[in-house]
Amino acid sequence: MFFVDNDYDESLEGISPDLYETPCYSIENLYAQKEVFQDIIQAEFGINQAHEDYKRCIDDYEKRCEEFVQGMEEFNALAYMRRQKTDSNSDVKFGSVKTSHLFDISVHQIVKSSHYAEEIEKIKKALDVTDTELTDSIKKLRILGDPVVKYRGKNQLDFFCSLLKQLKEYNNSGGYFSVKHNCVKLNITGNRLSELSQYALTPESLEAFLHSHFVLLAS
């Protein structure tokens, strides 16, 4: 069995029955989802759905998520354009651009970083992109569907984890939650995919893929 991220490449679906391609940009997108956030607030913060703090957390997450994906449109359009031009990563290393160099992320607002313009201009120059080409790429990107699913997963998960970490800090310092929640177990490090794996969404297509292969192995 082989697992690959879709990225912005042409779909590999159907090439081999042993190949599974993510239905989103990458595996990280399966973590950075509202449903996952809801589960973590309940399980790791010990806040049930009936509590006023739960509603506040979810409301703020939804607002900040919308702001973040709107802000990341230009960056993702450039990443999409690079994939259309070449499958080489030699021109621009999108993965090396820190999300914190694009946006300052907080529970209260999403603001462009002071480095944003510099980072975007460097990419545009490296790709030799015109404003017209960028506009066309943005239009094509919008057709792909939900940005939370189709935008670069690493950046989406950076945003997701930043909010969770800040909520944990606010629980310790006060000023956000109505009460201090004493059962917060959340700990996110550089090993975040493993640490949050129990909460990640499992697409139906992945369940079907695994089931079919387990049946073959058992036969």
Language model: regions and residue ranges:
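Acidic, divalent-metal-binding catalytic cores of TOPRIM
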Residues: 1-219
